[in-house]
């Protein structure tokens, strides 16, 4: 089989070739003549944990359904392990899907739910026995094999759904918001289990989620979608630290955005005057767009901003303001600061267990030139 490959670098910097498990080439999907998926291009490498992240209605679930075969591509190409998937039904694709709703059969116990797909394929009884046993062991559900779904917790049902997907030994496991129905504590626990399962099996996982933290913590790479299009693909660190668009900067985590125009453009820094009159200096580095437009957006993460009662000496990006809200979050404290030009900014600082300042306290907010990022202002931003 001639499988497409992608170039990557190992930790020593030596280029190697990795096969691609899933490829989308300029893929479109229309509903009522409106594009739900609009010219999507992406490659998913073999053994990768790849997440498609975006808000409701962005096209991420439709993209997953196209890969699974539940929807058909209207234009473009979709390949799995180098083979075109045009008109290939779901049951003939080397993929299995884990749904948010689990989709377990209530009248079947755990063992029979996991065995269902193998029996449908008329697998030998001995093979069904060994593979179901192996799958249940992977998800730590051997002792509950005789229970019915109604007798299981949400986390246990999720494990059964995972086992049912893994028992068929697919090349690609598709996860449709798999942890969305779980409470926060259980979701955190299942994130760890899902990550360990992926590492132990070495399979390709493609997950759809709207949960930024979930995508950042689990993924090797993330594709951020918006209005049917891919805004950016990168590692979690690249997506968070080096967003390419203001949508990505705003959607991934929290950020403070300032729209303005470049007034000084030097080799080492950029000076921007915002629409509200602030002058912000941004250090130029490898993350700065090669071609900057006159209109830009400055992104500053809340955790990059410092607060002090007195102005630091000879420092750019220092602005006077007042505290208008203080929110205690346990390990951190979130401050809402209104700058002298009337703009509100969010500041996140570690909890030092001291007395919190009162509201209306005059304060100075400042950040380093290297802690903010200039992004080209697009027409739809």
From Swiss-Prot:
Gene3D superfamilies reported for this sequence: 2.40.50.100, P-loop containing nucleotide triphosphate hydrolases
Predominant location category: membrane
Cellular localization per UniProt: Cell inner membrane
Enzyme class: translocase
Keywords: ATP-binding, Cell inner membrane, Cell membrane, Membrane, Nucleotide-binding, Translocase, Transport
Catalytic activity: ATP + H2O + polyamine-[polyamine-binding protein]Side 1 = ADP + phosphate + polyamineSide 2 + [polyamine-binding protein]Side 1
GO molecular function, one term: ATP hydrolysis activity
Bilayer topology term: Peripheral membrane protein
EC number: 7.6.2.11
One GO CC annotation: ATP-binding cassette (ABC) transporter complex
Pfam families, per the entry: ABC_tran, TOBE_2
Family matches, as NCBIfam families: potA (TIGR01187)
Assembly notes: The complex is composed of two ATP-binding proteins (PotA), two transmembrane proteins (PotB and PotC) and a solute-binding protein (PotD).
Function: Part of the ABC transporter complex PotABCD involved in spermidine/putrescine import. Responsible for energy coupling to the transport system.
Name of the featured protein: Spermidine/putrescine import ATP-binding protein PotA
Name of the coding gene: potA
